[in-house]
A protein has these predicted regions:
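Edge beta-strand at a domain terminus
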Residues: 5, 73-82, 112-131
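Flexible, solvent-exposed loop segments that connect beta-strands
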Residues: 29-44, 91-94
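Short, solvent-exposed beta-strand-terminating loops
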Residues: 19-31
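N-terminal helix-cap/turn-to-beta initiation motif at the start of protein domains
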Residues: 5-21
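Buried hydrophobic residues that stabilize the cores of well-folded domains
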Residues: 20-22, 37, 66, 75, ...
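Contiguous, well-ordered beta-strand patches that form the walls/edges
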Residues: 26-28, 48-111
């Protein structure tokens, strides 16, 4: 089970660690914007897209909704600019048999980050600021 050891021993970059909150959401189909929302300055409908992520050194990722309720406590691995998220380490090791989700860090500065997820002809982008 060398791969599990490699995942857990790979250092998580310091600039990714900590809490991040959503500030913008974009949903595109076939490259056309369907939804383009400024989450923090919007109305209650816009705030449904708000969440907070926390990345830790032990390859755990936590997600909370706008009310502070925890949505998940999962594992992640980083390969280049791709973050793969799964329910546990086994799911990361055998993604073909389990549900995983991969997001790409498409833009990153010290205090902001954009994560993009593509599935078929649909693209979702969340912009985060460090919390």
């Amino acid at each position: 089970m060398m791969r599990a050891y490699e995942i857990m021993k790979a250092p998580v970059p310091a600039e990714l660690l900590g809490k991040w909150e959503t500030i913008h959401y974009t949903h595109m189909i076939n490259g056309e914007n369907v939804t383009d929302i400024d989450i923090l300055n919007g109305d209650e409908w816009n705030k449904q897209f708000y969440h907070t992520l926390a990345f830790s050194e032990n390859h755990k990722i936590n997600k909370w909704d706008r009310f502070g309720s925890q949505l998940y406590d999962q594992c992640f691995m980083l390969k280049g600019d791709n973050i793969t998220i799964a329910g546990n380490l086994t799911d990361l090791l055998f993604p073909q048999y389990n549900y995983t989700e991969t997001w790409t860090i498409s833009d990153k500065t010290e205090n902001s980050m954009k994560l993009t997820h593509e599935q078929g002809n649909t693209t979702e982008c969340y912009t985060y600021k460090r919390k």
